[in-house]
Amino acid sequence: MKNLVKLLTVLFVGFVLSACTKNKAELGTAENPIKLHFVPSVDSKVIEDNSKIFKDYLEKNTSYKFEVTIPQSYIAVVESFGTKRADIAAINTFGYLIAHEKYGVEALMTVLRHGSATYQSMFVAKADGNIKKIEDLVGKKVAFVDPASTTGYIIPLKSLKDKKVEPKETVFAQKHDNVVSMVYQGQVDAGAAFYSPAFKNDKGVMEIEDARRLVLTQYPDVEKKIAIIGLSEPVPNDPFVFRKEMSAEMKTKIVDAMMTFVATPEGKEAFKAIYGVTELKKATDKDYDVVREMLKTVGKNASDLMKK
């Protein structure tokens, strides 16, 4: 019996020492890899396949070891920083504001899409109507997307408040394409939805990238029939964020490697497939102060908008 107790004691001590050794392993080693989180805004298999290419590149060019995880939601990513299960993550703007406030997470890069580091909202109305600018929406019926939609409500709401414009009635269409359809069909006087600038395709033809493109099949003449009457102020794109306890040297090496990767042909293809990203740009927390001020203006907080 005594021998059994001794054996169990030895095994227990060995287990504890092993666990402690693992916990003390330096970040970036095989025993304690840097945990990189990608939220599945597209098919998880697409992220899994392309993030492996990204992971292999980082390991080859930084000497660190990485582990890629695909959480189920932005909130899960935020809380992973609190439990130290995340070191780096691609996260949306509101998720970053929460993670920064609660856990000191740092935004070190922002994504670019077609050369733009920001995104905007737009107001649209019938091109042949009397509504030509945002100020003309006083006393009108306006469609928004959803109370928790950034480009479909929060940002355009700030635009209205800044100009002291009060519509007579507001409705929520639930989707960006529904907003455009309601304006096209005359169900509302105007609507607010996401805006991205038009770009030149491979054939040299300009293509619209705003919410109107979502109904091109249904309404081929939507670009002519529905006009943009105003744009919101620019808001910074989603950031790549880092846990604050990571060393400055480690952060610098990884940021440099990530920006180099996105500039390669395989990097461009991988990031475009994952998030429609074409480039990365260095960022700081101050870049997101405009979002904080926007939320104050409309009486919202980031936590409210992350519930949906």
State where each predicted segment sits.
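A conserved helix-loop-strand patch within extracytoplasmic ligand-binding domains
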Residues: 111-165
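An extracytoplasmic/periplasmic, membrane-proximal ligand-sensing/linker region
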Residues: 31-53, 59, 208, 246-308
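C-terminal motif of bacterial Sec signal peptides marking the signal peptidase cleavage site
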Residues: 16-19
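Periplasmic-binding protein-like
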Residues: 35-40, 114-122, 213-244, 252-255, ...
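Pocket-lining segment of extracytoplasmic ligand-binding domains
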Residues: 141-249
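Bacterial signal peptide processing site
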Residues: 21-23
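Extracytoplasmic small-molecule ligand-binding "clamshell" domains
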Residues: 26-93
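Beta->alpha turn/N-cap motifs
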Residues: 40, 70-74, 84-103, 111, ...
